[in-house]
Amino acid sequence: MINKLYIATDSTESFRFNIVDSTDLVQSVRDIHNTSATASAALGRLSTMAAIMSHELKNESHNITLNLQGNGQGGMLISTVNGRGEVKSYVSHPEVDLPTKSNKKLDVGSFVGNEGLLTVIKDFKLKEPYIGQTSLVSGEIAEDFSNYFYQSDQRPTVVALGVLVDTDLSIKSAGGLFIQALPGFDESLIDKLESDINKFPPISSLFVTHDDPFDILNQYFSDFDLKLLGQKEVQYLCDCNRDRVERSLISLGKETLTELIEEDGKAELVCDFCNKKYNFSKEELMELRDNI
């Protein structure tokens, strides 16, 4: 299923508003990785953030990778999006679940951890990718990205991410909101924006009752006279293929491939992002080795 990212600005072009209903995308995360409730919330939030950031990609071959490496029980979380709006994600320990917090919310902060690094890699196919890194603030992900954007862009930024997991572990709703001041923004509008944000309910709950994300923006930020700049389709789709896996095997070198042939006589590689299995016979491994 395909979701849509909506990109808007206000009448004074002081702020960019991005909003996405990522329910179907996060359901794919759940289905592929068989995540626990807490893991679904954590990886779902990160995947939603990747979808939101896809608006920066003007070329289909460009991509952004988000990496959370905290001290929590979930281990490493990764989400990558390309210029086509295709998101793929991974978590080290999808099976880990944690007790809910006292407010009955899923404990994403403990799953990720509040000590560690958030890394953003933007590959625009230049000589070197851009790599930005900040320390984790809470592990709740939205706060960590708000801090990242404040540190990297030096502009006021609001990030809201939410995943509502049903009792059967399916994804009831998921979505994200991103608001950032644009260069030369009207500072007199900050107080009004903060007032509207304080009235904003939990983002995931809104997509239970609203079908159109842009309607949500217009409802809660009506004073800003928003205009829609564009829409972008986003979905969970892994771009792995056999050729790429073959190149990975070749990169091991002749010696390692020879050991693999002699000891196992075959190989099975599993994609971390979609769990697709690639099997290679002894003859296929020998052919790869002989072509090095």
Curated annotation (Swiss-Prot):
Record has Repeat as a keyword: no
Entry's Gene Ontology cellular component terms: cytoplasm
Compartments (UniProt record): Cytoplasm
UniProt GO BP: protein refolding
Post-translational modification: Under oxidizing conditions two disulfide bonds are formed involving the reactive cysteines. Under reducing conditions zinc is bound to the reactive cysteines and the protein is inactive.
Gene3D superfamilies for the chain: Hsp33 domain, HSP33 redox switch-like
UniProt-recorded Gene Ontology molecular function terms: protein folding chaperone; unfolded protein binding
The keyword Zinc appears for this protein: yes
Entry keywords, A to Z: Chaperone, Cytoplasm, Disulfide bond, Redox-active center, Stress response, Zinc
Superkingdom of the source species: Bacteria
HAMAP family: HslO
The protein's name: 33 kDa chaperonin
